[in-house]
Curated annotation (Swiss-Prot):
One of its GO terms (biological process) is transmembrane transport. One of its GO terms (cellular component) is plasma membrane. Involved in secretion of bacillibactin. It is found in: Cell membrane. This is Bacillibactin exporter. Keywords: Cell membrane, Membrane, Transmembrane, Transmembrane helix, Transport. GO terms for molecular function: transmembrane transporter activity.
Amino acid sequence: MKNIIALSSVPLVMTLGNSMLIPVLPMMEKKLSVTSFQVSLIITVYSVVAIICIPIAGYLSDRFGRKKILLPCLLIAGLGGAVAAFASTYMKNPYAMILAGRVLQGIGSAGAAPIVMPFIGDLFKGDDEKVSAGLGDIETANTSGKVLSPILGALLASWYWFVPFWFIPFFCLISFLLVLFLVAKPEEDEDAPAVSEFIKSVKKIFKQDGRWLYTVFIIGCVIMFLLFGVLFYLSDTLENKYAIDGVAKGGLLAIPLLFLSTSSFIAGKKIGKDKGRMKFCVVTGMILLTLSFIALWWNHSFYFLFVFLSFGGIGIGMALPALDALITEGIESEQCGTISSFYNSMRFIGVALGPPVFAALMSNANWIIFILSAFCSIVSLFLVLFTVDAKKSEEEKNLGTV
């Protein structure tokens, strides 16, 4: 249990370190005297750097061990937060140094949160029930961070606008100490394969399992694209249409995320080792997400907005731990970190694309947003139905192959 608590702190801290800045961006724009595009780069550079570095960190964790990569990366993420905090507090023109700090934070986060998923698979190797339950806890921590971040960010910024930056190194240090002292080192093979052999094995995985792996990657990207796009839309709508801002806006943003977090926790506990349940959770989740966007196209008034987005949150919460489990249960641990890193990179691409795409669509008509979102959801649904074979996993497990 202590392993799970410590590892759950990593995605929680990484999510807080990024998402809690979102409600503070309008204030930063004024304080830094920059354009809206420039202030958006504070979020974008973090995601772009992480996208590039995640596969590298995944490979290194497969080669040298999860904990050996995770701990230094937590320190790098904390250092990045400290650079941004120091610059915003003491420098006259801190914008460039804030971006530099965010680059460092992105590098650190690339080797932190994405490594946790294969780490869980290593720690509970051979116990599929514990693996799926652990992944559910990890996704719950991740989504809990999203629930808390708009509220916490608004609260901290109400003191001084730069205070959220100071909490990033503080959170990272706590997570570092938890992982250092509470997480056991998983058993590792004595001899790591040569680089050429490792690359061959990864290519073999994509050749053999690429059909369902590509689907998992695409759906992970789509879900995060829709999630962060919708959060951007909801934040903008609450402030500009309903004149709700500050902590009140943060609390309202947290409502659909709370449903997401709860369903993620329950799904992670119920999935177990059954690939059929994993597929069922993804399919059901994408159906709920599709229906919620169709309903929003029909009516997106204030109350219906939260009702239907909460149903969509339940769908996303069901799908995420199942997607994680499909990878950790379907890929051997020697390559799991690398494969998981590709998956997490796709998720970060979704995070980076969501807000700007939704912002562009919002300049036209809201119904376009909901039609596009429903279309993306239904395409993902059909991909799962026709490319993920639930029966195949039992046969593979009996044969002892990937």
